[in-house]
Amino acid sequence: MFKTRFISGAVLTLLTIGILYLGGYVTGVAVMLLSLGGVFELMRVYKQEKSAMAVLAYLMTIAYYCFLFFHLEKYLLPLMILYVLLVLAVYVITYPKYTDKDAMVAILAFFYVSLLLSFLYQVRILKYGGALVVMVYICSCINDTFAYCVGVKFGKHKMSPKLSPKKSVEGLLGG
């Protein structure tokens, strides 16, 4: 198990480094595909991955990245407002097929996954964006390592036993 995790982690790390090194549209398309995968996974958690709400979230993700690629940033806010209104319209028109929970999941899927992941691309295209992205990655790795080491060595108080049984308050503070 460890060997498989190590090899897949090494391959993904090398792939990530290559994509970030190339920058531009390569990074943008990779992040867009990652966003679509994340939206799919979130929608699947709620058993909606093939619903009309999911299709709206997928299309919004693609449209959002296209707006970024073609430097149409001034239209992003109207696009996002239109998306929320469209999701709510589908909810109202198709009720009770789709519930308020379904509509909120579709809205969350775009904003929590696609919008937040897009900042990886947006930072990367800045003048020193490559260095900034690498710095964020390094800081995250250091934080995770310290949290793990402090938690293993000093962890006595469980943070959330049902959700994540091995995490401790000490590990949280160590990271």
Residue locations for each model-derived region?
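Membrane-embedded alpha-helical bundles of polytopic integral membrane proteins
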Residues: F2-K162, K166-S168, L172-G175
